[in-house]
């Protein structure tokens, strides 16, 4: 099989490495020439996955047309804000019958579309049925190291979900299939906002009780939004919902949790992301998820609080107080 991964960041490189490790011929594309040169010459990506050797069947190209030539599987692994321009550039070189796996997590700010909705907005209608989402508790570094991981692959066509599942399945990477694209996407992007809240809680020393409450109530508001968009609520109890949320809220590898800890220490989100050297999607998604919730009439108090901390200068401690002092209500 020939596969193309658009995006050579940590997640794109980890998935490209996984596919190449199965013996597939894989080409990574990116706009960062230095990263591509490192992959091509040294079979490494020291910027995003330092110290890890990449398979020799992983190649690199900075030309979209060349990278997609003969591709039987396309993985879209760019940051959420880059999905639309990259798909616009790539669409002439992708053909019907080729599965397109979107692993970007986000809600586009201007349109409030999920990533697959953005892709469908750009691609010709005959390509829409071949679109799939891969999401779940999966840090790139651990996947690249071959540590056991389970994820969800969602597609509207069961045949496409199964095809993508088979392409990615290894002895250390286990995909489950689903038909709930919306649920997987909403779970995958809004959990990053809740993870910022978890980082704030941890950074301010609020303890295990607060963390458990944040994860539980965070899942509740994620589920409300997903269901309003047509998702199956059970999806949010699975890998692409609860699984991804728990991982992102609890691990030091989480960039979004790191942002929250930095905010608790008095840093700005911009300064924290410069230190990280990578995108923390929850910063953008706090704004777009809030706007989507307002449009759909969904109550999302944690998302609202994080938005106010990031964009209105609300002190983290005041945000916690505001959440705790909301009008009392039944849990369910």
From Swiss-Prot:
What highest taxon heads this organism's lineage? Answer: Bacteria
Q: Which GO terms describe its molecular function?
A: glycerol-3-phosphate dehydrogenase [NAD(P)+] activity; NAD binding
Enzyme class (EC, first level): oxidoreductase
For this entry, the protein name equals Glycerol-3-phosphate dehydrogenase [NAD(P)+]
| UniProt-listed Gene3D superfamilies | N-(1-d-carboxylethyl)-l-norvaline Dehydrogenase, domain 2, NAD(P)-binding Rossmann-like Domain
Where in or outside the cell?
A: Cytoplasm
Checking SUPFAM superfamilies in the record gives: 6-phosphogluconate dehydrogenase C-terminal domain-like, NAD(P)-binding Rossmann-fold domains
Its primary localisation, in coarse terms, equals: cytoplasm
One cellular component term from this protein's GO annotations in UniProt: cytosol
Alphabetical list of InterPro entries matching this protein: 6-PGluconate_DH-like_C_sf (IPR008927), 6PGD_dom2 (IPR013328), G3P_DH_NAD-dep (IPR006168), G3P_DH_NAD-dep_C (IPR006109), G3P_DH_NAD-dep_N (IPR011128), NAD(P)-bd_dom_sf (IPR036291)
Record EC number: 1.1.1.94
GO biological process terms, alphabetically, are: carbohydrate metabolic process; glycerol-3-phosphate biosynthetic process; glycerol-3-phosphate catabolic process; glycerophospholipid metabolic process; phospholipid biosynthetic process
Provide the function of this protein: Catalyzes the reduction of the glycolytic intermediate dihydroxyacetone phosphate (DHAP) to sn-glycerol 3-phosphate (G3P), the key precursor for phospholipid synthesis.
The similarity annotation says:
Belongs to the NAD-dependent glycerol-3-phosphate dehydrogenase family.
What reaction is this protein's catalytic activity? sn-glycerol 3-phosphate + NAD(+) = dihydroxyacetone phosphate + NADH + H(+); sn-glycerol 3-phosphate + NADP(+) = dihydroxyacetone phosphate + NADPH + H(+)
- Short name of one Pfam family for this protein? NAD_Gly3P_dh_N
Q: Where on this chain does NADPH bind?
A: 10-11, 31, 105, 140, 255, 279, 281
Q: What pathway annotation does it carry?
A: Membrane lipid metabolism; glycerophospholipid metabolism
Q: Where is the active site?
A: 191
Indicate which residues the UniProt annotation says bind sn-glycerol 3-phosphate.
105, 136, 138, 191, 244, 254-256
Q: State the gene name recorded for this protein.
A: gpsA
What are the alphabetically sorted keywords of the record? Answer: Cytoplasm, Lipid biosynthesis, Lipid metabolism, NAD, NADP, Nucleotide-binding, Oxidoreductase, Phospholipid biosynthesis, Phospholipid metabolism
């Amino acid at each position: 099989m020939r596969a193309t991964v658009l995006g050579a960041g940590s997640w794109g490189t980890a998935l490209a490495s996984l596919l190449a490790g199965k013996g597939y011929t894989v080409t990574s594309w990116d706009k960062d020439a230095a990263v591509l040169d490192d992959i091509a010459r040294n079979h490494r990506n020291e910027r995003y996955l330092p110290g890890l050797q990449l398979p020799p069947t992983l190649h690199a190209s900075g030309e979209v047309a060349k990278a997609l030539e003969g591709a039987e599987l396309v993985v879209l692994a760019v940051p959420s804000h880059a999905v639309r321009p990259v798909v616009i550039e790539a669409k002439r070189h992708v053909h019907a019958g080729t599965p397109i796996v979107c692993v970007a997590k986000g809600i586009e700010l201007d349109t409030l579309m999920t990533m697959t909705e953005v892709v469908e907005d750009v691609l010709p209608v005959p390509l829409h049925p071949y679109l799939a989402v891969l999401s779940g508790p999966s840090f790139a570094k651990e996947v690249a190291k071959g540590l056991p991981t389970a994820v969800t692959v969602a597609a509207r066509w069961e045949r496409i979900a199964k095809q993508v599942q088979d392409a990615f399945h290894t002895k250390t990477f286990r995909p489950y299939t689903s038909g709930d694209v919306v649920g997987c996407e909403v779970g995958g992007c809004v959990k990053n906002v809740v993870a910022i809240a978890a980082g704030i809680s941890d950074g301010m020393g609020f303890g295990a009780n607060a963390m458990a409450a944040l994860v539980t109530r965070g899942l509740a508001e994620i589920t409300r939004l997903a269901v309003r968009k047509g998702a199956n609520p059970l999806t949010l109890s699975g890998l692409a919902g609860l699984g991804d949320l728990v991982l992102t809220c609890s691990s030091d590898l989480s960039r979004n949790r790191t942002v929250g800890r930095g905010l608790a220490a008095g840093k700005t989100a911009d300064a924290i992301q410069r230190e990280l050297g990578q995108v923390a999607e929850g910063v953008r998604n706090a704004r777009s998820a809030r706007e989507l919730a307002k449009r759909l009439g969904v109550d999302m108090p944690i998302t609202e609080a994080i938005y106010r901390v990031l964009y209105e200068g609300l002190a983290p401690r005041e945000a916690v107080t505001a959440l705790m002092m909301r009008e009392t209500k039944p849990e369910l």
